[in-house]
Structure formats: structure tokens, C-alpha cells
């Protein structure tokens, strides 16, 4: 049929549309973020009822003007296991919101879908082990935020002072040293008045390692950095997103509230 096309991508958000339909927000390598009507998806036993958030879908879509409609769908991968833990579910929702804020319709961001799926895979592995440390979930969502912001063109400027251009080289061991987080500008050397946050040398060094593929760990495999530091880096992400993105990423606050209250691990300082 004229106007039919196939789309593959990740369902970021699904909401009601009228009495029986759903509105699907899909992240695709081909078209960026696109909104699609899913007719009858809210009816019992609908063949399109599998259009749910955090699911990779293969879609047959009809219509190129206005709100296109899903004619058929096939589930390629479901991340429903994320719901086994509140922290992993909140983190996944934050990544979905961040992707919506970073990508426009008909303006795909190369590599963003792949990066989101990599981090969802990591979160789902955590969700399968209820006893796994909450700190790993927190660190994963912070690192994922750093990766997605960089891919979307809003990366944190981690290597140079936003005021002087001098290198941001943390002097490990000099605990009086500080750099300031200025959400509208970047990171600046020194403890500046009006800074949203200040980082000490070890906090900045940890932040500068996050663009790498893997989480920073000690030689024994334990995660680097105590929970208060990771919560501080999450707060940095929140204020950076508020200052630069066209829409809020509200689930980051849910992640913060959820993980602030989680029990500390055995090796975590109190």
C-alpha cells in the first residue's frame, strides 16, 4: 500500500490516545524520535497491545503526513524485567526522557539508540539480582547520562575551564582544591561565588572517567566512589539538563529520591 514503511526502534513512551488507541513515542535510527498512533491498542486482545514502553519494536507504519499509524508490530526485545526493581525502572525512565529531550523528529542522532540499548541491558542485568548494590544502578544512570548528552550535542565540557581555558587537571591529594559547576557555562577552576556545585579533585577525576565505555572500578572490581559522590554527580547532571535541554528530565529526581534512601552496601562508609 502506498505510504507504508517499516520502522524499528525503542518505545520510549506510550500514552492513551482517545478511547481505544495509544500514542507511541519511538526512538529510531532512521527518523529520530517519532510519534505514532497505535489504533485499538487499548482494546482487549488487540494484536497491537504489545506497544508498551521500553520495548524494541519492528513496525509497519502507514501515512507520512500528520500522525502516522501503526498497522502491524513485532516485539524484538522487551525490557519488562526492569520493573522488578524500582531503582532500575526509574533509571530506565530517566534514559527514555533524556532521549526524548535530545532527539528531534526527522533528525536522528547517530549512535544514540545503540547507546540507550547498551545501558538498558546493563540496568536489566542489575534488575535480575535483587541483592545487587543500589550504588551500581546509580553509577550506571550517571554514566549513561554523560554518554547520551555527549552524543546529543550537549556534552559536559570536562577537560578545560570554561572561564580561562586552562586544563582541568585534578591535583589528587590536594583536598583544598576546588572546581565550580556553572550550569550555563561548564566547569571553572576555583571555588566561585554562585556555583551550583563544587567538586574536589577526586570527584572531578571520577567525572572525567565517565565518558569511557565501562564504569570506573578498583583493582578488586569494586565500584570507585562512595554513594554521596555519585549522588553529587547525579545532581550535576540534573542542573546541566535543566540549563541546556529543551524539555525537563523529571525522572532524574525520582532516581535521586529512590537511591538516596536505599540501604548502604557492606563496604560503603557511613
From Swiss-Prot:
Key word DNA repair present: yes
Record-linked Pfam families: RecO_C, RecO_N
InterPro entries xrefs: ARFGAP/RecO, DNA_rep/recomb_RecO_N, NA-bd_OB-fold, RecO, RecO_C
Gene Ontology terms: biological process: DNA recombination; double-strand break repair
Keyword DNA repair set for record: yes
Keyword tags: DNA damage, DNA recombination, DNA repair
One GO cellular component, as annotated: bacterial nucleoid
UniProt xrefs under SUPFAM superfamilies: ArfGap/RecO-like zinc finger, Nucleic acid-binding proteins
NCBIfam families: reco
PANTHER family the UniProt entry points to: DNA REPAIR PROTEIN RECO
Purpose of the protein: Involved in DNA repair and RecF pathway recombination.
Homology family: Belongs to the RecO family.
Classification via HAMAP family: RecO (MF_00201)
Name under which the protein is recorded: DNA repair protein RecO
The species this protein was found in: Synechococcus sp. (strain WH7803)
Originating gene: recO
